[in-house]
Amino acid sequence: MDVTTDAGAPWLVAGLGNPGPEYASNRHNVGFMVADLLAERIGARFKRHGKAQAQVVEGRIGPPGPANRRVILAKPMSFMNVSGGPVTALRDFYKVPVGNIVAVHDELDIDYGVLRLKLGGGDNGHNGLKSITKSLGADYHRVRFGIGRPPGRMPVADFVLRDFSSTERKELDYFVDRAADAVEALVIEGLERAQSAYNS
């Protein structure tokens, strides 16, 4: 599979999460939060896509000229564990190379608010990534947003489906803003520069 990024092709940025107001503030929905902020920056609202089970925003990011990129922001509406279906449908509809796909997701094995950008690799037990990888292979970009490990013996499923704590919420806007910056840097400047700036 060709994983070379194509500057002339559109980028597909999929913020992962679960649909519905009861999940909106969960740790597992931080990908949706980042996608919402990116849409706000573009100045557009998410709309239901006619051919995929997803909400999308189409726009451009970056300065005028060769660094300006066409971007499709997406929030799969299929629930986290089957994110691969909507992402694949959007990939096919917009003819996006796999190397131009970015999944934004929560990551248990990284401290809260810390970012890690990478291309390819395993799913680390993340069911949203597992679903996408099953459909597309592993060679897409990831922006991993650290949420930390659950306290004590709390089951992982309970932890990720709970809202951020009151202490975490004090910094959440800052961290989501930084993650959106990282996505923009990845799309505009490339992975290595974005990693240098945001892999903390």
From Swiss-Prot:
Active site: H28
Family annotation (InterPro entries): Pept_tRNA_hydro, Pept_tRNA_hydro_CS, Pept_tRNA_hydro_sf
Site (Stabilizes the basic form of H active site to accept a proton): D106
The UniProt record lists the keyword Nucleotide-binding: no
Superkingdom in the source lineage: Bacteria
Subunit structure: Monomer.
Function as written in the Swiss-Prot or TrEMBL entry: Hydrolyzes ribosome-free peptidyl-tRNAs (with 1 or more amino acids incorporated), which drop off the ribosome during protein synthesis, or as a result of ribosome stalling.
Protein name per the record: Peptidyl-tRNA hydrolase
Organism in which the protein naturally occurs: Streptomyces coelicolor (strain ATCC BAA-471 / A3(2) / M145)
Native organism taxonomy: Bacteria, Bacillati, Actinomycetota, Actinomycetes, Kitasatosporales
Encoding gene, per UniProt annotation: pth
